[in-house]
Design a protein with these regions (language model features):
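Mature-chain termini and adjacent capping regions
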Residues: 1-171
Protein backbone atom coordinates (compact mmCIF):
# COMPACT_ATOMS: atom_id res chain seq x y z
CA UNK A 1 0.00 0.00 0.00
CA UNK A 2 1.34 3.43 -0.86
CA UNK A 3 -0.33 5.27 1.96
CA UNK A 4 -1.53 4.27 5.37
CA UNK A 5 -5.26 3.75 5.51
CA UNK A 6 -6.88 6.67 7.25
CA UNK A 7 -9.86 6.86 9.55
CA UNK A 8 -11.81 9.24 7.33
CA UNK A 9 -15.58 9.37 7.48
CA UNK A 10 -16.93 7.31 4.59
CA UNK A 11 -19.14 9.00 2.05
CA UNK A 12 -20.31 5.75 0.51
CA UNK A 13 -23.76 7.25 0.28
CA UNK A 14 -22.58 10.26 -1.74
CA UNK A 15 -24.13 8.86 -4.90
CA UNK A 16 -27.45 8.37 -3.12
CA UNK A 17 -27.31 11.91 -1.75
CA UNK A 18 -26.57 13.33 -5.19
CA UNK A 19 -29.35 11.27 -6.76
CA UNK A 20 -31.82 12.36 -4.10
CA UNK A 21 -31.00 16.00 -4.72
CA UNK A 22 -31.33 15.54 -8.48
CA UNK A 23 -34.63 13.66 -8.18
CA UNK A 24 -35.96 16.31 -5.85
CA UNK A 25 -35.81 18.82 -8.69
CA UNK A 26 -33.39 21.02 -6.80
CA UNK A 27 -30.29 19.91 -8.70
CA UNK A 28 -30.26 23.02 -10.87
CA UNK A 29 -30.24 25.20 -7.75
CA UNK A 30 -27.50 23.25 -5.95
CA UNK A 31 -23.98 24.54 -6.58
CA UNK A 32 -21.07 22.09 -6.49
CA UNK A 33 -20.18 21.09 -2.92
CA UNK A 34 -16.61 21.56 -1.65
CA UNK A 35 -15.77 18.72 0.74
CA UNK A 36 -12.65 17.68 2.62
CA UNK A 37 -11.40 14.27 3.77
CA UNK A 38 -13.75 12.41 1.46
CA UNK A 39 -13.99 8.69 0.66
CA UNK A 40 -15.93 7.00 -2.14
CA UNK A 41 -16.50 3.25 -2.04
CA UNK A 42 -17.59 1.06 -4.95
CA UNK A 43 -18.84 -2.27 -3.68
CA UNK A 44 -21.10 -5.13 -4.61
CA UNK A 45 -22.51 -7.01 -1.64
CA UNK A 46 -19.70 -7.58 0.85
CA UNK A 47 -17.00 -7.16 -1.83
CA UNK A 48 -15.37 -3.70 -1.99
CA UNK A 49 -13.82 -3.29 -5.44
CA UNK A 50 -12.62 0.31 -5.27
CA UNK A 51 -11.97 2.83 -2.53
CA UNK A 52 -11.05 6.40 -3.50
CA UNK A 53 -9.90 8.83 -0.81
CA UNK A 54 -9.10 12.51 -1.33
CA UNK A 55 -7.91 15.32 0.89
CA UNK A 56 -10.47 17.59 -0.75
CA UNK A 57 -12.77 17.77 -3.72
CA UNK A 58 -15.66 19.39 -5.48
CA UNK A 59 -18.79 17.26 -5.96
CA UNK A 60 -20.99 18.43 -8.83
CA UNK A 61 -24.51 17.00 -8.65
CA UNK A 62 -25.27 18.26 -12.16
CA UNK A 63 -22.57 16.14 -13.81
CA UNK A 64 -22.47 13.43 -11.11
CA UNK A 65 -18.69 13.86 -10.86
CA UNK A 66 -16.22 14.63 -8.12
CA UNK A 67 -13.04 16.61 -8.91
CA UNK A 68 -10.51 15.41 -6.33
CA UNK A 69 -7.19 16.65 -4.94
CA UNK A 70 -4.42 14.60 -3.24
CA UNK A 71 -5.92 11.24 -4.12
CA UNK A 72 -5.32 7.66 -2.97
CA UNK A 73 -7.21 4.85 -4.75
CA UNK A 74 -7.16 1.15 -3.92
CA UNK A 75 -8.64 -1.65 -6.05
CA UNK A 76 -9.22 -5.27 -5.03
CA UNK A 77 -9.00 -8.32 -7.28
CA UNK A 78 -11.84 -10.84 -7.36
CA UNK A 79 -10.09 -12.79 -4.57
CA UNK A 80 -10.29 -9.69 -2.32
CA UNK A 81 -6.51 -9.08 -2.30
CA UNK A 82 -5.09 -5.66 -3.23
CA UNK A 83 -4.69 -5.51 -7.01
CA UNK A 84 -3.82 -1.86 -7.63
CA UNK A 85 -2.81 0.94 -5.27
CA UNK A 86 -2.46 4.45 -6.75
CA UNK A 87 -1.66 7.94 -5.49
CA UNK A 88 -1.88 11.07 -7.62
CA UNK A 89 -2.17 14.83 -7.40
CA UNK A 90 -5.69 15.06 -8.83
CA UNK A 91 -8.48 12.80 -9.92
CA UNK A 92 -11.98 12.67 -11.29
CA UNK A 93 -14.50 10.15 -10.00
CA UNK A 94 -17.76 9.51 -11.86
CA UNK A 95 -20.42 8.89 -9.21
CA UNK A 96 -22.78 7.18 -11.65
CA UNK A 97 -20.36 4.74 -13.33
CA UNK A 98 -17.50 4.46 -10.78
CA UNK A 99 -15.03 5.29 -13.56
CA UNK A 100 -11.94 7.09 -12.31
CA UNK A 101 -9.21 9.23 -13.88
CA UNK A 102 -5.93 9.76 -12.01
CA UNK A 103 -3.95 12.86 -13.03
CA UNK A 104 -0.64 14.43 -12.11
CA UNK A 105 2.36 12.24 -11.24
CA UNK A 106 0.43 9.01 -10.96
CA UNK A 107 2.37 6.44 -8.93
CA UNK A 108 1.15 2.96 -8.22
CA UNK A 109 1.82 -0.56 -7.05
CA UNK A 110 0.38 -3.57 -8.85
CA UNK A 111 -0.84 -6.62 -6.93
CA UNK A 112 2.42 -8.49 -7.58
CA UNK A 113 4.54 -5.64 -6.15
CA UNK A 114 5.67 -4.00 -9.38
CA UNK A 115 5.72 -0.20 -9.17
CA UNK A 116 4.82 2.20 -11.95
CA UNK A 117 4.69 5.89 -12.73
CA UNK A 118 2.82 7.76 -15.47
CA UNK A 119 1.34 11.24 -16.01
CA UNK A 120 -2.23 9.86 -16.02
CA UNK A 121 -4.26 6.68 -15.75
CA UNK A 122 -7.92 5.91 -16.38
CA UNK A 123 -10.04 3.15 -14.84
CA UNK A 124 -13.04 1.78 -16.76
CA UNK A 125 -15.25 0.16 -14.13
CA UNK A 126 -17.45 -1.79 -16.57
CA UNK A 127 -14.38 -3.49 -18.09
CA UNK A 128 -12.36 -3.71 -14.87
CA UNK A 129 -9.36 -2.23 -16.71
CA UNK A 130 -6.91 0.48 -15.65
CA UNK A 131 -4.98 1.95 -18.56
CA UNK A 132 -2.90 4.79 -19.92
CA UNK A 133 -1.65 5.72 -23.36
CA UNK A 134 0.98 8.01 -21.82
CA UNK A 135 4.61 6.97 -21.29
CA UNK A 136 4.93 4.62 -18.33
CA UNK A 137 7.81 3.13 -16.37
CA UNK A 138 7.36 -0.07 -14.40
CA UNK A 139 10.04 -1.24 -11.98
CA UNK A 140 10.21 -5.02 -11.63
CA UNK A 141 13.00 -6.91 -9.80
CA UNK A 142 15.87 -4.65 -10.80
CA UNK A 143 14.67 -3.91 -14.32
CA UNK A 144 12.75 -0.99 -15.65
CA UNK A 145 10.06 -1.65 -18.23
CA UNK A 146 9.17 1.32 -20.42
CA UNK A 147 6.21 1.58 -22.69
CA UNK A 148 3.91 4.00 -24.41
CA UNK A 149 1.14 2.85 -22.11
CA UNK A 150 -0.37 -0.17 -20.41
CA UNK A 151 -3.56 -2.11 -19.87
CA UNK A 152 -4.06 -3.71 -16.45
CA UNK A 153 -6.95 -6.07 -15.74
CA UNK A 154 -7.61 -5.13 -12.12
CA UNK A 155 -9.77 -8.15 -11.30
CA UNK A 156 -7.25 -10.72 -12.59
CA UNK A 157 -3.94 -8.84 -12.21
CA UNK A 158 -2.86 -9.23 -15.85
CA UNK A 159 -0.62 -6.46 -17.23
CA UNK A 160 0.15 -5.67 -20.85
CA UNK A 161 2.55 -2.91 -21.93
CA UNK A 162 1.58 -1.15 -25.14
CA UNK A 163 3.22 1.01 -27.82
CA UNK A 164 6.91 0.21 -28.06
CA UNK A 165 7.73 -1.55 -24.81
CA UNK A 166 11.41 -1.88 -23.86
CA UNK A 167 13.34 -3.39 -20.95
CA UNK A 168 16.27 -1.65 -19.25
CA UNK A 169 18.39 -4.06 -17.18
CA UNK A 170 20.39 -2.65 -14.29
CA UNK A 171 23.99 -3.92 -14.09
Amino acid sequence: MLATASKRPRLAGALGLCAAIALGGAASAVPPMRLSKMTFVSSEGAFTELTVEADSGLVDTQSNRAQLESVHALWAATDGQNSLDVVCERGEFDLATNNFVALGRVRGVLGDGRRFESPWMRYDHSKGVAYTDAPVEIVDQGRTLRGGGFRYAVRTGKLRLTAGASVVEKP
